[in-house]
Each structure stands twice: as C-alpha cells, then as structure tokens.
Amino acid sequence: MAEALQELAAHVEMRQPDAILGHRIEFGELTLDVAPNRIVGLVEFLRTDARCRFSSLVDITAVDHPERPARFDMVYHFLSMYQNHRIRLKMQVREDETVASIHSVHPSANWFEREVFDMFGILFTGHPDLRRILTDYGFRGHPMRKDFPTTGYTEVRYDEVQKRVIYEPVKLVQEYRQFDFLSPWEGADYILPGDDKART
C-alpha cells in the first residue's frame, strides 16, 4: 500500500509541480502540502486524472495554530473509489488570507466551506453563498478558534414568560476554577502487584 501511495505522490508531483510543496505518508494515507493559490487546479486534476480519480470529497476542515504566522491549516480529504485510495491536502493560510472555493469542481464543498467559515472565520472567494451554517444569525466570533472563550459571549435561552428566544450576556454561577496543579499520580513510582517479579 505504501508503495502505491509513493507512486501516486510522485505522479501528482510530476504533473502538478507548482501546486505541491511536499508530501508524506502517515497512517496509510498520503498527505500533500499544497500551495494555496493552486488548490482549485490541483483538486480538478485529482478528480479528472485517470491515475487519481478522487471523485468523492469526504471533508474540509481547518486547524488553528495561533502561534504561527500562517495561523490555519486548511485540510481537504478525498476518496478514490476507483483506485481505492484516500488523499489529504493541507495548506497553510494566514488569518487575513482568503482561500479559493473548490465549489466549482466539487459542488458538495458548499456546506463544508460554510462550516469552516462559521467555525474558523476563513473566507472563501468564489463561494456562491458564504454565510453561517451552524451558529445563530447574530453570533459573534468563531467558536473553533483557540482564542474563542469556552463560555462564549452570549447565552441563548427560551423565555416562557415572553414566549420567545432571548439573548443575554453570559452569567457564570461560579468563578473560573484553576486546574493547574500537580496530580498525586504524576511522577510517582508505584510498585504494582506483579512488578516485583519483573525486576528479579
């Protein structure tokens, strides 16, 4: 399997040299590092090339790395049922950078890209309907970013008296708790039953 993936990587790198920055095989899957300005052309190639035929878009997501200048990793997963392969495309994107939509190649990317926009705030150029898909209309922020507060900014609840949904600032019933302490189990060297036999 690894040999077939290595051959596939060499084929893609040979046919799309400007798009591929590098590759690796991890967990039985091929990962290609992609130049952001080449994503649409590469996805089109992977879908139509006879040796690839990655016709199924499985998922699009992002990973937040706030400490990096290119804050986000955009991650695309594709499946080729014809070749029985999976492939992962990764590209690094700055916070102020837009990403070209692959909706024209894979119409199923529509809702995946909307979800990435909603959760991470990454903008897609050429998307037909880029608006929130999981959060409410007036939602502030992007909840999958690592700098988003775990409590959120507003509390949404249904009010029985007013017979409608109301929005209120978050009110915590207790103070934040600090869990930064050493566990009694960390660093201990316990002798468990049966360990004494292994040492002799």
From Swiss-Prot:
Its main location: membrane. This is NADH-quinone oxidoreductase subunit C. Its EC number is 7.1.1.-. It is a peripheral membrane protein. It comes from the Bacteria. InterPro entries: NADH_DH_suC (IPR010218), NADH_quin_OxRdtase_su_C/D-like (IPR037232), NADH_UbQ_OxRdtase_30kDa_su (IPR001268), NADH_UbQ_OxRdtase_CS (IPR020396). It holds the Pfam family Complex1_30kDa. HAMAP family: NDH1_NuoC. GO terms for molecular function: NADH dehydrogenase (ubiquinone) activity; NADH:ubiquinone reductase (non-electrogenic) activity; quinone binding. SUPFAM superfamilies: Nqo5-like. NDH-1 is composed of 14 different subunits. Subunits NuoB, C, D, E, F, and G constitute the peripheral sector of the complex. NDH-1 shuttles electrons from NADH, via FMN and iron-sulfur (Fe-S) centers, to quinones in the respiratory chain. The immediate electron acceptor for the enzyme in this species is believed to be ubiquinone. Couples the redox reaction to proton translocation (for every two electrons transferred, four hydrogen ions are translocated across the cytoplasmic membrane), and thus conserves the redox energy in a proton gradient. It catalyses: a quinone + NADH + 5 H(+)(in) = a quinol + NAD(+) + 4 H(+)(out). Keywords: Cell inner membrane, Cell membrane, Membrane, NAD, Quinone, Translocase, Transport, Ubiquinone. PROSITE patterns: COMPLEX1_30K. One of its GO terms (cellular component) is plasma membrane. It is found in: Cell inner membrane. Belongs to the complex I 30 kDa subunit family.
